[in-house]
């Protein structure tokens, strides 16, 4: 069994790392370069850097900050937020990223995943999915087949601001078919709440795709990380709040996962 990965996440806006609850109420967590260096030293398996307002603000990639972060870490670095084109992938890889993450752009133009994967390989193309459990009203929504959507999760774009009406599990499967090498799956309902992953969502997507799934959104304890793997079927677990504010270190997280029988790199 392959080692399961622990991935701290840097949500960046205005050149600072922030953390919110349910994608709002953002709170400052510090300088991205300093925080990245800290996680590298703590033994994180990978690092994810998301420019969370690039798409909604219509901004370009913040390459200087990405270059500075990349210079501090010697573990795989995934960069997302405002990634729109195959050319953006090239620019990010040149800036020091190892993987690039598409979200809203893949929804607007799914072909970009085929093109980016064909050119650079599936191993460096991640598709991020921001999923939210359907409300009772959303469940009644009629699909193209004339049937009500029913229970499940919808995909949101533009930093969680816009409901696309796409089914999260079906969308993940389509992205994997088109060449995504990994799915970064965030539960918007759980984001920042510290109430644990949405394990039903994680399991549904993990079972539906042949590529690794990174569970994100809701970690409040070290056992939540282990649950993402053992109950959710995730290949990697991503967390922000519990690491940023010093509640736990990556080393403590790995120790707890190992105690729970999850294979990790210690």
Curated annotation (Swiss-Prot):
It comes from the Bacteria. One of its GO terms (molecular function) is imidazoleglycerol-phosphate synthase activity. Keywords: Amino-acid biosynthesis, Cytoplasm, Histidine biosynthesis, Lyase. The active site is at residues 11, 130. One of its GO terms (biological process) is L-histidine biosynthetic process. It is found in: Cytoplasm. GO terms for cellular component: cytoplasm. Heterodimer of HisH and HisF. Belongs to the HisA/HisF family. IGPS catalyzes the conversion of PRFAR and glutamine to IGP, AICAR and glutamate. The HisF subunit catalyzes the cyclization activity that produces IGP and AICAR from PRFAR using the ammonia provided by the HisH subunit. This is Imidazole glycerol phosphate synthase subunit HisF. It comes from Delftia acidovorans (strain DSM 14801 / SPH-1).
